[in-house]
A protein has these predicted regions:
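A broad, low-specificity signal for short, low-complexity segments enriched in glycine/proline
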Residues: 5-6, 17-20, 123-129
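Feature marks short, highly hydrophobic, charge-poor N-terminal signal-anchor/signal peptide-like helices
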Residues: 1-9
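Membrane-cytosol interface at the C-terminal ends of transmembrane alpha helices
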Residues: 11-111, 143
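Extended hydrophobic leader/signal-anchor segments used for secretion and membrane insertion
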Residues: 115-246
Length: 246
């Protein structure tokens, strides 16, 4: 999908959000139009469900947002008294569309002072696991990632099977091109041969700003655009540098 197509999809999601939640905004003491304003509507929703505004950022980070959306659906339902296991199941199983049913058919009462702490040990454990997965995925995808050397191409300095951590900040982390993927899994689901991602939709090639350029003798990790296997190499030259070949 091109950036234009993603923009159109973003506007479509805003329409879906508005139609399914505007009565919830009104019940929480907000204006109905606030549910229709892109980005601003999410900030207001965070206030309605009693969560920090910086959660809004997580909803726009690829891979991380796949974890955050179900959390937001459940938190929204609970903010209006829908706390049962069935409500939680329906909210997730219908990809949030259960909120439409609540929005248009139920008597809406906003619980502004609800407790944000889990009432059971299981609930507390799930919350802790979700938080750990989000942090680990954020670090794994955009900050640093562990790799195992797959080939003997650098055998004079690194051996096959060597384990190392690779910084993604130095040369600029690449935004994941697969919008739907399992967190912290590279290519296939463990113990299976199934792909851990969907080939469509795809995000156009984007890369975050680099902290520094590539220098000679740096160990660099890369993969071909059409390949999922990562390779390691040690650059011996830079663009514009003339090197004699014996």
């Amino acid at each position: 999908m091109s950036l234009y197509q993603w923009f159109v999809f973003f506007l479509f999601i805003q329409l879906v959000h508005f139609l399914g939640t505007w009565k919830l905004y009104v019940a929480a003491g907000r204006k109905s139009w606030e549910a229709a304003m892109p980005v601003y509507n999410v900030i207001i929703l965070m206030k309605i469900i009693g969560r920090p505004s910086w959660w809004t950022i997580l909803l726009f980070i690829p891979v991380i947002n796949l974890i955050m959306f179900p959390i937001i659906w459940v938190e929204t339902l609970r903010s209006f008294g829908k706390r049962s296991t069935l409500d939680t199941f329906l909210g997730i199983a219908t990809f949030g569309l259960y909120i439409y049913y609540v929005n248009y058919t139920q008597k809406l009462t906003h619980i502004s002072d609800r407790s944000l702490k889990a009432k059971t040990t299981t609930g507390d454990t799930v919350n802790s696991l979700l938080f750990a997965i989000i942090v680990a995925t954020l670090v794994h995808t955009y900050v640093v990632q562990p790799y195992t050397i797959p080939t003997p191409s650098l055998e004079k300095s690194l051996l096959v099977g060597d384990f190392l951590f690779v910084s993604k900040i130095n040369y600029g982390a690449r935004i994941p091109m697969t919008a739907v993927a399992l967190p912290m899994v590279h290519d296939s689901i463990p113990l299976t041969k199934s792909k851990s991602y969907l080939s469509w939709p795809q995000i156009p090639y984007l890369r975050m700003p680099a902290a520094e350029g590539i220098n000679r003798s740096d160990i660099v990790v890369f993969n071909w655009p059409v390949d999922t296997v990562h390779y390691f190499f040690e650059p011996k030259g830079k663009p514009g540098v003339i090197k004699p070949v014996d």
